[in-house]
């Protein structure tokens, strides 16, 4: 797939996508604030270091991290990178796909975020191996992707097609993939974007989104 032809300004404006057409930007503050609250406890022992957002889009997630960190972002979309730079002028951005050899040295990052990326890729396992290479031993990886269960299959089929979701993983498949690519699972859960903490608290597997916090081993 030619990702750069798919993820253009039209995709992020909602013309060629589903969730952006619903006003994704308006809900992003709540969504990314909730995500950061989950990640934040794992930053307590990382006073300084490098953070990478894989598939950073407009850079909303990087904005949540304190400036004491060196913040990096990659995305296949040149348009997205331009917008991310506006929101994060002190961060470093590169145009790159997660399935390609990532433009960073081995063992470079302390924390890597991969929010709603794997479902867009032809080979999510390759992307996780690439991420593993550039993450420091003991480094933290946060992954979020649609949970392909009965709820997702029946209620989100149109949305997934419109969003170009080509690799849909169940929650257990995501955990297995992380284990196979060299990560130790520290925590995992499923959730709904509108009821984030309900699913987080009760650890239900019926949420239509799946997430895991893992560590490089």
How should each PLM-predicted stretch be described?
Residues 1-105, 111, 115, 128, ...:
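Conserved N-terminal segment of class I S-adenosyl-L-methionine
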Residues 139-145:
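Conserved beta-strand signature within the Rossmann-like core of class I S-adenosyl-L-methionine
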Residues 116-120:
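A short His-aromatic
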Residues 166-181:
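Short alpha-helix
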Residues 121-125, 145, 149:
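A structural helix-start
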Residues 125-137:
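A short glycine-rich, Lys/Arg-flanked "PGG" loop and its adjoining helix->strand segment in the class I
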Residues 146-166:
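Short, glycine-/aromatic-enriched active-site segment of Class I SAM-dependent methyltransferases
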């Amino acid at each position: 797939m030619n990702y750069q032809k798919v993820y253009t300004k039209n995709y992020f404006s909602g013309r060629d996508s589903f969730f952006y057409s619903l006003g994704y930007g308006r809900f992003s503050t709540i969504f990314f604030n909730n995500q950061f609250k989950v990640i934040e406890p794992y930053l307590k022992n990382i006073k300084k270091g490098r953070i990478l957002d894989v598939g950073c889009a407009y850079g909303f997630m990087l904005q949540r991290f304190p400036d004491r960190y060196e913040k990096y972002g990659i995305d296949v979309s040149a348009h997205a990178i331009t917008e991310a730079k506006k929101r994060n002028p002190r961060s470093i951005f590169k145009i790159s796909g997660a399935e390609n050899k990532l433009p960073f040295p081995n063992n470079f990052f302390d924390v890597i975020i991969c929010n709603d990326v794997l479902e867009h890729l032809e080979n999510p396992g390759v992307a996780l191996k690439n991420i593993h290479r550039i993450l420091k031993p003991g480094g933290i990886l946060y992954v979020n992707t649609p949970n392909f269960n009965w709820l997702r299959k029946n209620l989100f089929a149109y949305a997934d097609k419109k969003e170009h979701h080509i690799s849909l993983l169940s929650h257990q498949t995501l955990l297995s993939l992380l284990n196979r690519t060299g990560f130790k699972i520290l925590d995992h859960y499923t959730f709904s974007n509108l009821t984030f903490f309900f699913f987080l608290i009760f650890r239900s597997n019926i949420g239509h989104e799946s997430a895991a916090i893992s560590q490089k081993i």
